Structures are given as C-alpha cells and as structure tokens.
C-alpha cells in the first residue's frame, strides 16, 4: 500500500472493465469493445495543493473475429493508467511556478479496428469526458484561475478529428467550451475530440490517444479548492462504421504521386537550385534518378508527407552512455517512448522501385503547429557514429580496418539502430510492410580537395588507415559543387540485407539505415564550404536538434574521421564520429503497401 504524509490524502485507485455490445445491421457485424478511462483528482491543501489525477481502464481486452461477410469488423477501445501525484514539497507557495508543471503524467486510449479483407472500412468516433454525478465540478462550484494561467490542465494528442484539447487547456467547466450540465443519470460532459476516424483494408489498424494531466503550483490562494474531489471518466462514444469496395484503392506510391500533382508534373532540379536553401513557400515534389530507377522526393516546407506505421513493444530509454534500455538504469536516462506508442514518420521520397523511404519522427501525432516543423520528439536519442575516430575506416556504417569499403564490423550507430528495430518495435514482425532498400554510405575518396567526379573519387591506388587526408564523395558533391545525387557510386557502399535488382552489399541484418547528406540538400538545406553558413529552419527535416547523416565528410589531417550531420540551428555541417548526436532511423515501405489518408497532420497516412 502506498503511504502519504499528513498533508496528502490517499490515492483512490480503482479499475472498471469495459462493456461489450454487438450490433447487427444488414450484412455488417460490428463488435465494439468500449472502455472507460477514469480520472480522479483529490485536493488537499490551502495554497497550492496535492492533486492525484488518475486515469484507469482495463486494457486486457481481446477479441478474435473472422471477417468473412462483407463489412465485418471489430472496433476495440482500451487504455492504460495515468497517475499524477504531486510531492508535498511541490505544494508550498514558495515553490510556485506558473510556467512549469509541478507534476504531470500520461494515460493512453488505444483504438483498434480490423475490417474485412477486400473492403475499405471506415469508423468514426468521439472521445468524451464525463464527471461522476457525485463529484465536484472543477470551475463550476469553486473558483479557477483566469486568463492564460494554467492550474489543472488536460492535453490530448492523437491522429485526427476535431481535437478541442490539442493544446494544453485548463479543464474547467465552461458551457462556451461545449460542456453540458449534469442530469440525474449523467454528470457534466464535454467532447474532447469530435469525428476522429480510423480506416482498414482488412489489416489491423490502431491509433493511440495520449491524455496528459498536469498540475501547476500557483502563487495564489487556492484555499477554496482544499478538500475538493474531482472525478470522472473519458470514453469513446458515437461509433459509426461503414464498408465499401476496397479493391480500387491505389498502391501507396500511386497515392502519394496523385496527391502531389502526378509524376508528369514533377521536374528535375540542378545545382543552381541546390545552391540555395528553400523558403517557406518553396515546396513540392521533384524527381531524380537513383540506383533503381526514377525517385520522387519531397522538398521544402511540405506538410503532407506524414505516415503512422509501427508501434513500440516496450518502454525505451536513451541513457547518457549512448545505450538504450527498457528501464531507467539511473545513468541520466531520458524516456523516448512507452510500450504501445505509435511511430510517426516523414516520407523522404519514393524510391526507384516504388518503395517509400521514411525518416523517424517520434511518437506524438503532428498538430497544426507542428505540421511542417516538429521540434520535439523526433529522435531515437543520442549515439556516437563510431566509438573510435582515429582511423579513416571509422566513417563507415560498417567497416573493416585496412579496407576502404569493408563491412566486417558494425558501427556504433548501426548497433544502436539494429537494437531499436529488432527489440523495441514491431517493425520486424511477420507480415511487416518494411522492405529491403539501398542505404548509401559513400566511401569513395580523393586525396585532393576537388569537386566530385568518378575519376576524382573512384581511382585511389592505395589505402591508408592513418596519415593520409581523405575527402569523401559526398564532400565533393555537396561542398564543392552543390550537386547532390541519389545514386551510390560503388556496390560495396550500397547497404542492403539482400541484393535488390542485382545491387547491394547484402551486409545488413535489418532493413534500416540513415538519411544521406544528398537527401538533406535535396530536401531544402545547403552546405557550403565558404564561411557563410546557410541556415534553413523552414523545411520539413528541420527539428531544432542535431542528428547524424550517413555520409562521410573527410578524414581530417589523416587523424580524425568526420561524418556529415544536421545542426539544430538549421544548417548542415559535420562532426567527428565519436561525438554524440541524435539518431533518426530510415526505413522503406513495400511498393505493394497501400496508404489511406492524405498525409496531412489531421489525415496522416496509415499503412495497409
């Protein structure tokens, strides 16, 4: 049993099972498992107070349904627990802070839909909050803060719908916000999210809603709240599902092209275009050759390249020693994700074989304010590129000492990404839509500081691990010539799991890699070797934090290996490989994948 000090009332903790309902309409069989998410808030102090903000729901809900009749589907709503407890020291008025929450915690509402094979099933639903009938109602019978001052707040993050709490908002009763008065059977109620949707082409589709509760210790007399209890529940209602023919839904790459004007409208850019960064109005899709055909890539301030695919299978922490763990090891660990969190991506480009290349973009859904630039929750944590930096080979995603293009040993960052992919996500599950693809780690080199050409960078007659200055291929293309390429110069640097159309080194354990500096420049940034730093904070790959690219820069003075990266200030640069930078994995969806949605922040692509 949890014990509290004299200033704290005990936490009321309880759990209620959901209710099961069956509905039959024409040929549709709809199985709906409806969960309830409980909130309990106990007040116990004069000035700032101790709050227990508790959300509970049975999450052991399971169902198997054979979808044989047209339109058969299962719709499941379940959740975990949010438990916000404020330490006694945070209650004192001398600790008041109107900007930083004294405590916060997050609960989850998980929605799962499985439709019938061959049919496009669409379910809409609302997410509502209802006070218990015997509870106090915050903001109706007791005073609340006014204006922008935050006290007891709710923030709701999810994939789509009209979300009234997408930004943190005081959770006070206010009929202008849509609150309804209590009745004899129901407490006061407000709709948090209206018209959220989930679609399925026969595969299981799900979305996680995050409900964040926060308590602010105010420099105000809050005696009127002392001893009050605010309890309620959050649940799904107004579930409406329909089915239609799903056989005409386009493949994913076709959908992307159609949503961006079609392949025929896309042009090829030149070094003149790449010599400058994009502006906020400079955006779209363009084309360029890659190793497998014609690639179509996003550039500039695009906001329609969002994808939700995959989930975390366990909690994940990034610790100060550059490792990841399922628990907080105490080594200055930062939590990256919770088990069950959705994974969001940004599409970089359609590859030449029509697979879809994407870069990791966190576990929170985009909002209107983050639809182009998302500056939080975009990295898998920090890692060195390689723990060692004193040999030329250490610029490699894999390397063999004594060889220019070796693949005998994994780099530090490859080990990090492989561990994440295989052990912390469901991306490696049977039936995954992730497919093999070429990830270029261009180690062609020159001993001269010259622009890139095959002659200049592919004709070394000897190789030295130390003592010789090397400039790598990406340096010659980007720094000297503003001529990025999506082709990879030699097969030994085309990192793949298996051969793809007779190309690739087959050295990878898992189909995951890093973005190249060429892709970053084509997306809208620019690297210049002049003293003038080009800054772009308006294109979709800007995150406000440093992260690695997978392109070698140079072996400086014959003693230190350097790799390209992106700086949080908005410019492309480089660091020695032993430095700790952000990690953003890159994967590719199969060319057979189908995407539902439009890719915008409130209609994110989902993968079928």
For the regions a protein language model found, what residue spans apply to each?
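Short, Lys/Arg-enriched N-terminal segments with co-localized hydrophobic residues
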Residues: 2-3, 7-21
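Long, domain-scale functional regions
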Residues: 72-76, 203, 244-608
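C-terminal, structured domain-capping segment
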Residues: 105-123, 128-134, 188-244
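Extracellular adhesion/glycan-binding regions together with long Ser/Thr-
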Residues: 23-26, 88-103, 162-217
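N-terminal segments of secreted, surface-exposed, or virion structural proteins that
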Residues: 80-135, 312, 317-319, 338-341, ...
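Short consensus segments that form the blades of beta-propeller domains
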Residues: 139-146, 223-225, 334-339, 575-577
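Surface-exposed interaction patch
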Residues: 42, 51-54, 97-178
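Short, polar/proline-rich extracytoplasmic segments that appear immediately after membrane translocation
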Residues: 15-98, 224-245, 598-601
């Amino acid at each position: 049993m949890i014990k509290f000090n004299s200033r704290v009332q005990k936490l009321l903790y309880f759990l209620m099972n959901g209710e099961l309902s069956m509905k039959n309409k024409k040929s549709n069989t709809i199985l709906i498992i409806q969960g309830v998410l409980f909130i309990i808030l106990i007040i116990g102090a004069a000035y700032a107070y101790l709050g227990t903000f508790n959300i509970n729901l049975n999450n052991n809900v399971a169902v198997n349904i054979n979808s044989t009749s047209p339109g058969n589907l299962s719709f499941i709503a379940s959740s975990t627990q949010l438990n916000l407890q404020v330490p006694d020291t945070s209650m004192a008025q001398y600790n008041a802070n109107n900007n930083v929450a004294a405590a916060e915690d997050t609960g989850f509402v998980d929605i799962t839909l499985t439709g019938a094979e061959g049919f496009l099933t669409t379910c809409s639903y609302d997410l509502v909050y209802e006070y218990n009938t015997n509870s106090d109602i915050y903001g109706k019978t007791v005073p609340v803060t006014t204006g922008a001052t935050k006290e007891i707040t709710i923030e709701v993050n999810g994939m789509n719908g009209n979300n009234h709490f997408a930004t943190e908002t005081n959770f006070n009763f206010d009929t202008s916000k849509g609150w309804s008065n209590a009745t004899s059977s129901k407490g006061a109620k407000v709709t948090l999210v209206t018209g959220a949707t989930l679609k399925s082409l026969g595969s299981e589709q799900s979305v996680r809603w995050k409900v964040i509760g926060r308590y602010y210790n105010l420099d105000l007399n809050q005696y009127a709240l002392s001893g009050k209890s605010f309890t309620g529940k959050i649940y799904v209602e107004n579930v409406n599902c329909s089915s239609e023919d799903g056989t005409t839904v386009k493949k994913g790459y076709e959908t992307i092209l159609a949503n961006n004007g079609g392949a025929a409208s896309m042009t090829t850019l030149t070094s003149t275009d790449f010599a400058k960064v994009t502006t906020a109005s400079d955006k779209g899709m363009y084309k360029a050759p890659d190793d497998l055909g014609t690639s179509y890539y996003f550039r500039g301030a695009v906001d329609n390249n969002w994808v939700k695919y995959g989930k975390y299978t366990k909690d994940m922490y990034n610790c100060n020693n550059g490792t990841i763990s399922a628990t907080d090891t105490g080594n200055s660990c930062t939590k990256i994700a919770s088990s069950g969190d959705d994974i969001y991506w940004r599409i970089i480009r359609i590859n030449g074989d029509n697979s879809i290349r994407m870069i990791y973009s966190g576990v929170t859904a985009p909002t209107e304010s983050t639809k182009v630039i998302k500056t939080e929750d975009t990295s898998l944590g920090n890692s060195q590129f390689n723990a060692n930096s004193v040999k030329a080979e250490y610029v490699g995603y894999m390397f063999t000492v004594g060889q220019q293009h070796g693949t005998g040993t994994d780099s530090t960052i490859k080990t990090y990404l492989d561990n994440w992919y295989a052990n912390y996500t469901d991306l490696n599950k049977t039936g995954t839509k992730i497919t093999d693809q070429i990830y270029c780690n261009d180690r062609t080199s020159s001993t001269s500081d010259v622009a890139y050409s095959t002659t200049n960078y592919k004709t070394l007659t000897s190789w030295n691990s130390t003592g010789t200055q090397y400039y790598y291929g990406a340096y010659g293309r980007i720094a000297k010539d503003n001529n990025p390429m999506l082709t990879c110069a030699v097969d030994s640097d085309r990192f793949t799991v298996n051969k793809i159309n007779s190309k690739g080194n087959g050295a990878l354990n898992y189909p995951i890699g890093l973005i190249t500096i060429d892709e970053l420049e084509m997306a809208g940034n620019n690297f210049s070797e002049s003293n003038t730093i080009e800054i772009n904070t308006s294109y979709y790959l800007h995150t406000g934090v440093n992260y690695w690219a997978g392109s070698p820069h140079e072996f400086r003075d014959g003693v230190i290996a350097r790799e390209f990266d992106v700086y949080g200030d908005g410019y492309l640069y480089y660091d020695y490989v032993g430095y700790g930078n952000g990690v953003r994995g890159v994967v590719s969806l199969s060319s057979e994948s189908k995407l539902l949605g439009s890719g915008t922040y409130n209609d994110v692509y989902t993968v079928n």
